[in-house]
Amino acid sequence: MQLGLDFNLVEDLVAGVDEVGRGPLCGPVVTAAVILDPSRPILGLNDSKKLSEARREALFEEIREKALAWCIARAEVEEIDRLNILHATMLAMQRAVEGLSVTPRLALIDGNRCPKLAVPCAPVVKGDSQVPAIAAASILAKVSRDREMVELDRVYPGYGMAGHKGYPTAVHLEALSRLGPTPIHRRSFAPVRELLDVSVQ
């Protein structure tokens, strides 16, 4: 049994914010913001990377049912290429917080920097393994993005996206060099850009 984080740490109207998908060579960066309800405990919350896929899927449904408010947002590949991955991630986090149906009094952001927000915010390094609301956000973002990559694997077969979720694994890099980039590959990322540079020459 995975005990997860102490739900007593949940505070009123504090949003946790996290992202998934900064490192992949393709697909969007997905963010989530979650305000947990202290009166409706969710057991087993933890950093999404520490949970099994089945546990993440179960918690995904429970978080959406029990949270006071939640929002999943994103920045598209075109925005990542235009803005760079850091700025696109900040934009997607901003969208997640702005999309909440309840205004938080504070937003806690996983990592070491905050996006520009209309509410007070603070960064929390390794927040997804310390703050229950950030852990919940990490689960919503990861399950949402993983499901999308499984769908995109059907649209762009041969790259193995359902398995590696767009990350630069040996399988992905080999398929990329053999098949070339798809419309959902990030042109600003070195392995994709280098392939395009070679094809232009």
Curated annotation (Swiss-Prot):
Stored InterPro entries: RNase_HII, RNase_HII/HIII, RNase_HII/HIII_dom, RNaseH-like_sf, RNaseH_sf
Per the UniProt entry, the Enzyme Commission number(s) are: 3.1.26.4
One GO BP: DNA replication, removal of RNA primer
Q: Which Pfam families match?
A: RNase_HII
Which residues hold a divalent metal cation? D18, E19, D110
Which cysteines share a disulfide bond?
none
GO terms, molecular function: manganese ion binding; RNA binding; RNA-DNA hybrid ribonuclease activity
Indicate what this protein is called per its UniProt record: Ribonuclease HII
Q: What Gene Ontology cellular-component terms does the record carry?
A: cytoplasm; ribonuclease H2 complex
- Locations listed in the record: Cytoplasm
Per the record, the domain of life is Bacteria
Regarding protein family, the annotation reads: Belongs to the RNase HII family.
Known cofactor(s): Mn(2+); Mg(2+)
Enumerate the catalysed reactions: Endonucleolytic cleavage to 5'-phosphomonoester
Class of this enzyme: hydrolase
